[in-house]
Amino acid sequence: MRSELFAYDRFYKQNFGTVIGVDEAGRGCLAGPVVAAAVILEVQLDVFDSKQLTAQKREELFLQIMNSAEVGIGIATPEEIDLYNIFNATKIAMNRALASLNKKDAYVLVDGKSLNLSQQGVCIVKGDEKSASIAAASIVAKVLRDRIMVAHDRIYPCYGFSKHKGYGTVHHLNAIREFGPTVFHRLSFSPVLSNLSVKKVHDLFSENINCERAKVILRKLSSS
């Protein structure tokens, strides 16, 4: 039991009442969405930063959290990441997670810094190592995002999404170079954009070439 994480949350609960932990998964990836979770955790579980847990342990804790806590989920798509940038898309996902939880008077503990969300709270650097609620949110967000990436591995089998989950591994970068990016990739990210051309953008979007996302990518290509 990581009691120090619950003691950290207890301080905020004593001062502000209900506390929501918020975290995201997938911010640094080259493909797929950003997934955020908002968690109200009232029972003590053996939670910790999802990055320091095995996949099996994350799955076990995910089920425990979903069965014993109040959970909200928010997703920002690759299209939204390209349109609004990764920082703003992360805020969109987190605000959606909070909105789905619908606890407007609760106090938010969010992992990170300088994130102004839709309700009162505080940003905590390395919050997933300090707060039980944030740690629980990190587990939920990570597990759900991993499942999304595994599902898309069946749609785009050349890229190995089930293995690297969209991160910029050597295998993934080689696949992007060999097969070209997909609409599931974050086309505005430099390692992806560098493998695009005007023709490839037209091929990707075909009849939707006049959509805002295509226009953004074409502008980036022309200025690169």
UniProtKB/Swiss-Prot annotation:
It is an enzyme of class 3 (hydrolase). GO terms for cellular component: cytoplasm; ribonuclease H2 complex. Residues 17-201 form the RNase H type-2 domain. Manganese or magnesium. Binds 1 divalent metal ion per monomer in the absence of substrate. May bind a second metal ion after substrate binding. A divalent metal cation binds at residues 23-24, 111. The keyword Nucleus does not apply. It comes from the Bacteria. GO terms for biological process: DNA replication, removal of RNA primer; mismatch repair. Its EC number is 3.1.26.4. It catalyses: Endonucleolytic cleavage to 5'-phosphomonoester. It is found in: Cytoplasm. Its cofactor is Mn(2+); Mg(2+). Keywords: Cytoplasm, Endonuclease, Hydrolase, Manganese, Metal-binding, Nuclease. GO terms for molecular function: manganese ion binding; RNA binding; RNA-DNA hybrid ribonuclease activity. Endonuclease that specifically degrades the RNA of RNA-DNA hybrids. NCBIfam families: PRK00015.1-3. Belongs to the RNase HII family. This is Ribonuclease HII. It comes from Pseudothermotoga lettingae (strain ATCC BAA-301 / DSM 14385 / NBRC 107922 / TMO) (Thermotoga lettingae). The lineage of its organism: Bacteria, Thermotogati, Thermotogota, Thermotogae, Thermotogales.
